[in-house]
Amino acid sequence: MMLFAGIDLGTSGIKIALVDENGACCATAARASPVDIPHPGWSQQDPDQWWHLTVECFDELAADHPALMARLKAISLSGQMLGQVLLDKADRPTTPCILWNDQRAIAECAELLERVPDIGLRTNGQPDPGLTAPKLLWLTKHAPAALDTADVLMLPKDYVRLCLTGERATDITDAAGTMLMDCASGAWDDELLAAAGWDRARLPPLMQSCAPAGQLRTELCRRWNLQDAVLVATGSGDNYAGAIGVGASVPGRAALSIGTSGVLSAVDASFHPAPDKAILTTPHAAAGTYLSMGVVMAATQSLDWLARLTSTSAADLASLAEVRAAAGIAACPVSRPSITGVRSPDNRPDASAIFSGIMAGHDKADLAYAVLEGVAMQFYAAYQAQRASGVPVDHIQAVGGGTRSPFWVSLIASLLDTEIAIPAQGDISACLGAARMAMAASDPERTVEILGMQKPPLLTVEPVAGLRDQLLTRYAMHRRLAFTP
């Protein structure tokens, strides 16, 4: 049986999974990838760091699992989205990659909107500092040399694939987050490019996520003792790969990612844009479908922030919150845990976190509950916007670190009034999705079958009886906080 490697380039690290033809994970390797925060609101990484860590992971797999690696047939990638990777003619980075959660380009968002008033209709989203185009404008003002020497603009996973193959390319899902592509047509838009100070000549070929993008370089095959030529598929943005990893490739299926950020991704057969609600709808990695995404800027990141503040682990805080909720939630504070701004549905990148109703008797358990509930309510606000635009949000599977707290998932299930399945190996869903794209590139006639594979869930979380009414009462208070300066 042949194996397939799925690389997940995340914000916090690199993971690689070796997956068999049935979608089962056979081996993994991972490395942490620190984020550089040189100024408040900034968030960046060195692209070379991603490549070095990828090599370390493959070195580990080759050393510990040589028999498995010898059966490797194809590789594909999932990557954190929106970060600009500018490369010179020698394919060397000209500047650090400004990440998806960076806030430095707020002023440039207004400039883009002024230059292209209908930008929301073309890109299905309003300008946000995390997106790629505003960053290009910011670099024009503050680091022009990085732009002057740049020969191509790529996205994070594209740089790793370039190092694997020597070939430049990007895919339609990652391109959709740049604000340089018309999301309805799936093509680069020259007016958007001009508004961002960029040009088509400095863009890579635009490919489908499951398309072959090259072969693994010969020297890497030798380094890892691979027997045959290894195909490398284009890959996709992480939210798309995570959805594919749980079989969310056909209309009516959805994926709920509770990671550093949070994303509710729903597969749709039709294009239902909702740019006024900051819901991003783009072509999916499963060709012929669309993915509607409601984004929570800080999900587990909000709990991690409170963990640092209280010198308590995130897991312990989640447990304390569950105990507090069992005693009643009416007296708990209400929070807007938007420590990195708000995306869906209010599009307020400048928003800060708020706790309301804190009293002398409250403790870290109350604050922990308020954070978990606040994130759940942000998911619910995005869900309402998606449903209002005509997107089916059904058959939800939850992945990401937040699923380690079934209580947290139960808050979301109660608000959405639907059961949520937690799949086995949901923590590597993006790796699994990338591996499936590698399989599809190797056997294109089975693409629909491969991308839609689903396994029985590890756990199904039901709405808590009687909780929804209590949460909706508190949701009204939460929504009032949404528009507080």
Predicted stretch roles:
Residues 1-95, 149, 221-222, 226-234, ...:
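N-terminal glycine/serine-rich phosphate-binding loop of ATP-dependent small-molecule kinases
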Residues 16-18, 23, 75, 102, ...:
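Conserved small-residue
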